[in-house]
Amino acid sequence: MLPDHLDYDLKILFIGFNPGLQSEEVGHHYANPTNRFFAVLNKAGLTDRKLSPEEDHRLLEYGYGLTNIVDRPTRGASDLTIEDYVQGRKHLLKKINVYMPLVNCYVGKGVYQKLSGIKKVDWGFQPINQVEGVRDFVAPSTSGLVRMSLKELTEIYRQLKLY
C-alpha cells in the first residue's frame, strides 16, 4: 500500500483519487512520468524546486501532505467501485479530522465530487467545506491525460500560495 505523508499543522493536504499502478509499484505518489504534479507545484511557487516522486515525503518540509480518497491501486480512477468510495470517504474524513490541515486540495474535480456529493464544482476555493475549520480547494488533476496546459494548471494551483 502506498504510504500517506501526513502530519499535524499542515498548510495543505493534497488529496488524489487513488494510487496508480506505477506509483504503487515504486512506492511514491504521482510517479508516472507523464504526471505533472511536482512540476506544477514548482511552477506555482509552492516548492522552491521541482521535486521528484522519490522525494514525495519531502513535501512535509513545506507543510504539505499527500493522501488519496481510496487506498486501492488501479490502472485508473474509472476502475474504482462505489464501495471503494464509500469506505474511502470514511477513512479520508477521519484523517482530515485528526490532522486538520488549513486547506484540503482535491487533485481533480471528481475527487471532491465523490467526497462531497456536490455535482457542480468550479476550480478554486469552495463555498462549502467538508470539515469545519478546513478550507476546500479543487484543482485539476495533473495527470498527463488531462488536456490543460502546464500554464493553465499552474495558474489554478498558484492560488494556494496564500498558504
Question: What are these model-derived regions, one by one?
Answer:
Residues 18-20, 47, 110-111, 143:
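Catalytic metal-binding/acid-base residues of hydrolase active sites
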Residues 11-17:
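Short, hydrophobic/glycine-enriched beta-strand segments
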Residues 19-22, 72-74, 142-145:
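A short, flexible beta-alpha/helix-coil linker loop
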Residues 61, 65-115:
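Internal catalytic-core helix/loop-beta-alpha segment
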Residues 15, 106-107, 139:
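Short hydrophobic segments within beta-strands
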Residues 1-6, 50-59, 94-95:
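Short amphipathic alpha-helices and their capping/turn segments at secondary-structure boundaries
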Residues 23-83:
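Short, surface-exposed acidic-centric catalytic microdomains
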Residues 3-11, 33, 40, 76-92, ...:
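C-terminal capping/extension of enzyme domains
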